Structures are given as C-alpha cells and as structure tokens.
C-alpha cells in the first residue's frame, strides 16, 4: 500500500502488535497482502496472563480479553507523542496515522486537517 511505502521514507519504524492467537494473525496476513511486510510483535499472550504492556498502556479490554485498537506514535526518546484508541468494532486509518506522523516530524505548529507535506502555521 502507499501508506506502508510512505512510512519507509519517513525515518520511522512501523510495528504492529496483537493479542490475537497465531491462527488469527495468519488469517489476517492472508487477507491483507499489502500489509505482510510490516513488522509484527506479539505483545501479550492473554491465554497465559501476559498482559503487563497492554495494561500499562491502558488499552486492555477485559470483557474481550484483548487489546483495544490503538495506535501510538513514539519518538526516538521513547516519549509517546500521539495516541488514538478505538473500540474493537472500529478500525484505524493508516492515512490519518501518516498525516499525524508527518505533522509531528515538522517540529512546527500544524493546523487541523493539514495534509501530508502541507504548510505549517
């Protein structure tokens, strides 16, 4: 996808994580050929009670035993610069993530709805 290749030119590392089991991840990868090249990290094995990271980040949804759909943009100093968290039934927007990353990387004040590469304030 264009968003995936754009990330590679952004001096950024894109990782994905999941509390899904291996069977779910294989099915997801088969359904999304364009996203197979993204590095994927298994953050927690909910079957074994390994929840510390997703609990610390505040994205564990106990009724489902899974992490909510979250995106974190973290700078090189490990400071979270941007967070979005959605319920399990709402997907995320790769284009919006790239737009926010682009704005953060300008180091300047950016207007709402600024497009990637657009002018700063």
Summary of predicted features, one role per range:
Residues 1-121:
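Chalcogenol-based redox active-site neighborhoods
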């Amino acid at each position: 996808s264009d968003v995936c290749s754009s990330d590679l030119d952004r001096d950024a590392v894109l990782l994905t994580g999941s509390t899904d089991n291996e069977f779910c991840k294989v099915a997801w990868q088969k359904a999304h050929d364009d996203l197979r090249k993204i590095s994927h990290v298994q953050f927690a094995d909910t079957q074994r009670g390994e929840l510390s990271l997703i609990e610390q980040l505040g994205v564990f949804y106990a009724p489902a035993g899974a992490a909510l759909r979250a995106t974190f943009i973290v700078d090189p100093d490990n400071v979270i610069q941007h967070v979005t968290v959605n319920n399990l039934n709402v997907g995320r927007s790769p284009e919006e993530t790239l737009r926010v990353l682009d704005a953060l990387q300008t180091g300047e004040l950016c207007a709402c709805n600024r497009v990637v590469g657009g002018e700063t304030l």
